[in-house]
Amino acid sequence: MRALTPPTIRAAFRGQLGGFALDAAFTVPATGITGLFGPSGCGKSSVLRCLAGLQHLPGSSCEVGGEVWQDDTTFLKPHHRPIGYVFQEASLFQHLSVKANLLYGAPRESGKAHADAVEFDEVIELLGLAKLLARSPRNLSGGERQRVAIGRALLSQPKLLLMDEPLSALDRLTKDEILPFLERLHARLSLPVIYVSHDITEIERLADHLVLMQSGKVLAVGPLTELQSDPKLPLAIARDAAVNFDAEVESYDADYGLVRLQIDGGRLLVPSAPVATGEFRRVRIAASDVSLARELPQASSILNAIAARIVITSPVGANEMLVVLALGREGHGGRLLARLSRRSWDLLQLAEGVDVYAQIKGVALAPGRDGHV
């Protein structure tokens, strides 16, 4: 029996939008969160409008989960595409309560909801909206308004959720309040999401896959961690370059306030509030927080030293080296970045293929994806 092909989102949008040329083609899994990332004005929002059918570029194509939304003979109008759309600014009906706003997006036709339909009570719980239902949108904070807008989009029972810079109008504190709610949605719902942002911290927290854009074109497509660690791409050579791992909690040491995490190719000890064994957390490790040693350090204040192999190197400027490491004694684990001075590189006599220990000075641990904020 032939194995089932995993569902995908396939899109190719080409054409002129005023004075802007869009030439963006990509295929991504129709699962999880796909980040659409690049500098302002690179065409991210234009791609989202094309996916929604709000922009019609002849000769383009779009297929979601095996359903053709656009090709040479087909073009589904926006209201015929099963999408939810969350904009930068939450557009709520001021004369309706929060509950009425949420229900406004729900399908009124019997049988319209699909097998993965999300229930009203589930949306309320996931987004923490129970105490807001009777209130007017006029009395909501910016973060609360955006959570209501997300809930309304979910209750329209979409097969694809489009999010166009949903946090860009919010201050950093409010963003930090909303991100855990988005992580809960990611953990609990099977709905595929295309998430547009020019803020790499949002992408690092949320995305599983990444479409990297520049000047109307797609530079690269793939799993987030692969693109983060590719020295040919701008993410890896940026001064704030980092990689992410999805880690499983192995144990918690209450005496020292440390959680032991299993990642692909090693283990980490990270300061944390109490967590339960078996939880999954996303961790971020900056290249600037990684140093290398030829031998396992015997006395060091750095808690984490993981065996690794140098697999790729690339000069950065005249006096630095970008090093891509594969974790594990055989170099079969996840990829990690380190940024070294050329002097350190020469003193340690490093080269591709050399086995080292990666000393990790700092690890950023995201809130849980298990439904707890």
UniProtKB/Swiss-Prot annotation:
PROSITE patterns: ABC_TRANSPORTER_1 (PS00211), ABC_TRANSPORTER_2 (PS50893), MODC (PS51241), MOP (PS51866). It is a peripheral membrane protein. Its EC number is 7.3.2.5. InterPro entries: AAA+_ATPase, ABC_transporter-like_ATP-bd, ABC_transporter-like_CS, Mo/tungstate-bd_C_term_dom, ModC_ABC_ATP-bd, Molybdenum_import_ModC, Mop_domain, P-loop_NTPase. GO terms for molecular function: ABC-type molybdate transporter activity; ATP binding; ATP hydrolysis activity. ATP binds at residues 38-45. Pfam families: ABC_tran, TOBE. Residues 4-240 form the ABC transporter domain. Residues 299-369 form the Mop domain. It catalyses: molybdate(out) + ATP + H2O = molybdate(in) + ADP + phosphate + H(+). This is Molybdenum import ATP-binding protein ModC. It comes from Rhodopseudomonas palustris (strain ATCC BAA-98 / CGA009).
